[in-house]
Amino acid sequence: LITLASEAWWTEKLGEKWTVTDAAGYCFGQQGRKHYSPDKIRGVGFWKEKSAIIYNAGDRCFTIESGKIIETSNIREEGTIYQRSESLPHPETIPMSDEEGQAIIDYLNSFAWREEMGGLLLSGFLAQGITAGFIDTRAHVWINAPAGTGKTFLVSRLKELLGNYSLSFTGGTSEAGIRQKIGSGARLVLLDEMEAANQDKYSKQKVEKIMSLVRRATDGETSIIGSKESVPIEFRARSSFLLLSIGNSLQRTADKSRFINLHVRPNKGLESFEKRDDAANKLAGISPGKLIARMMSLASVMATNANLIQQKLSAHPALAGRRAELLGNILAGAYALTHAGIISEPEIDIYTAAMNTGSLDENQETDAERCLREILESRVVGNSETVGQVILNYLHGDSSIERQDAKKLLDGIGISVYRPQGGNGSSQMLFISAQNRQLSNILRDTDWGNCWGDVLRNLPEASWLSEKRVRNSKHKGVVIPIEAVKSLLEFDLSTESQ
């Protein structure tokens, strides 16, 4: 009985000297009075109850009255039942301060983001991810982080900040397993090693099911799932998802409108490590309970700020519609980490100006650019590295043997890096065969499985080469200056091996 409701609740309904028999009688008496609705059963997380916020911490529920966080019943007069489960972090009496919120932003900014506001956007995502059940539309983030970027440290630090408020999985986890673990809750979900999706057809199907779950979670859509007992089961996902991988598996336009895609560059020297360590040390005093207390106190303010930011972002053609709404939630979350009030118009202008100059609008990427990115981020057959990484090995290998091994791998998929006659280091070219069978297999399950050569010809910097020898065979294909793909390869041409 205590798992259904607290002892105080039963006492309120049945009097001081109630017995189990009294409770059973009360339950029988309630039968038929209300129709069961899955939406009335809520798991752990933040929730909106009329205009109030409810935080179900599993073993207890909390709300805010007169500006203070207090404990409340898990059975509401509105008919909502907040399920009991494992205990999540309780909100602490003293919430996280503005300075501590800035420390989170500073730590995330210590990573080498390709995007101008990468650290700020990730910090805002974490804030809105905590309140995912309280808001109507949820953003998701996909971080592309190759080896040497500090991804392992990032994931570890995020887990420490969130405690068991977040659910953590690896790419090998099934959609059903994730769905069952989420249950009726609204916890933030971390999914690492999503590059496993590129290994085989079965893995790709598994990740596609996970992506379907993420799509439904964006707006909290209800799914009807069959069971062995032939009884349909309703499931409603209301979590925000953070996915991490080496490459990017976002293909559908529907997915790109729901995700903010961020990229981390490799570390550059000892100084970057020291900067990150210093920033990490400042997180030591931030507990999950302090972070949750701040988000509870500011959830309603965040919703107001999100609407204000969204209105301004919607004026920008590339950010209109759903994208403006999701970015509004994220930026409002980032603002709430360091400010407790309503955002001002000049502060919104600072955000929107940065959005206009950033590289967040993945939908503006052309089909040819997406095709090239798919090739560079795919894994070489028989090797754990991506095509882009093998190209880097060829250009920057520490030894002639390493560069020769890289050349053999590239030859096998019809790709060659060469310097035209009379050219200098900065004029190196990338040749991609339009006829290679292994490259065709890599692109088999994409939109370009039989036409990648024609598609790549549409790149502004590309030209067609009717004959190029690769591994003693003649090939037709596309030639692209290495300089034109350096943003995808993410390396400094000034350090190129001669």
Language-model segment annotations:
Residues 138-142, 188, 240:
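Residue-level preference for the first positions of well-ordered beta-strands
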Residues 182, 226-243:
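AAA+/SF3 P-loop NTPase mechanochemical coupling elements
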Residues 1-116, 249:
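Segments of Walker-type
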Residues 234-237, 248, 252-356:
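Phosphate-sensing "switch" segment of ASCE/P-loop ATPases
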Residues 4-7, 80-84, 197, 209, ...:
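DNA transaction DNA-binding modules
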Residues 178-229:
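Conserved nucleotide-sensing/catalytic segment adjacent to the nucleotide-binding pocket
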Residues 73-178, 183, 316-317, 324-327, ...:
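P-loop NTPase catalytic core of nucleic-acid-dependent motor ATPases
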Residues 154-157, 209-217, 238, 254-258:
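Alpha-helical scaffold elements adjacent to nucleotide-binding pockets in ATP/GTP-utilizing enzyme cores
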